Structure formats: C-alpha cells, structure tokens
Amino acid sequence: VYTSARRDGLQAQSLAVSFDGGYTWEKYAGNPVLDRGSADFRDPKVFRYAGADDAYWVMVAVEAAERRVLFYRSDDLLSWTYLSDYGPAGAVGGVWECPDLFPLPYVSGAGSAAGVRWVLLVSLYPGGVAGGPATQYVVGEFDGIRFVPDVAHPCVAADAAEAGEHRIGGIVE
C-alpha cells in the first residue's frame, strides 16, 4: 500500500503487488483502495494483526496537517474500514508524517517475559529542536481497534527518539 497523489492535490492510498520479490510492481487496476478526499492523507504502514479470535490487516496512516494518526482494518487489502484515530497529542509543531505502530515485548525484573506494549512513532516536520524533522513516540495498548497511551507517560517529546537535519520517517520492521 502506498500514497498516490492526484493531479487535483488530493492524496489516497493505493495498492501495488510484486511477483518477483520487489524488482517490479504492478498497480492494482481498482486504485485507490482508500480515498478520504484529503490533501494530507498519507504514509501508510500496513501490518497483520492477530487478535484472540480474528486476524486482519491494519493500516496506520496520518492526516498530516490535522496531526492525527488513523487506524483502518481490512481482510483483503482492498476494502478498508475505519477503526479509530489518535491525536493530536505530544509535539504538534509542523505536520505529522510517517507513522508506525509495533508491539514491543518486555521482561519482568526477574528476566522472564512479562507482556507486550505497543509503540506508536510519529515524525514531525518541522518540529525538531533545530527546526528540522524529529520523531516522537508514545507507549500504550493496541487492541486491534484503538491505540490508548499509557497514562503515566503519555508522550515522549520530539527529539527524544530521533532528531537531525535530514532524519524523518523511521520505520520498524
């Protein structure tokens, strides 16, 4: 899934597939697969979410100027259903870019597995200390529908995760 920019200035999410390991790509004839009619809807990250009873695709994207992260679900990568959104929160200078959401296992003080927290990354541009890009992160819970930040530490300030004149859009695989 990628962001397609239309001639009228609007952005939508489209699909392309590769049958040769990523050397060439074939665009889906029915593109776009998700169109909000927005000029700032971009930067999708898609991952497979496995809940207790169901597994499906989750798309994390931004409404950049609104400083919101949007969550969608799909069973087939073609039809998307809105789940929820997060933001604005934390650093809100500039626009939000390149969101990422991933699980992070943690261990207890004794060294045994204790659970999983979810980390939401959002890049800002501008928004960094030096006026350039930066990345902030939020730790919380994701239940397959909604991201809820931890109350004790709702947001780590921009630049705490990443900063620099040309650094933006880190993605965790």
Language-model segments: what does each one mean?
Residues V1-D43, R48-C98, P105-A163, E173:
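Beta-rich carbohydrate-recognition and catalytic domains
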Residues H166:
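Cationic, low-complexity basic patches in intrinsically disordered or flexible, solvent-exposed regions
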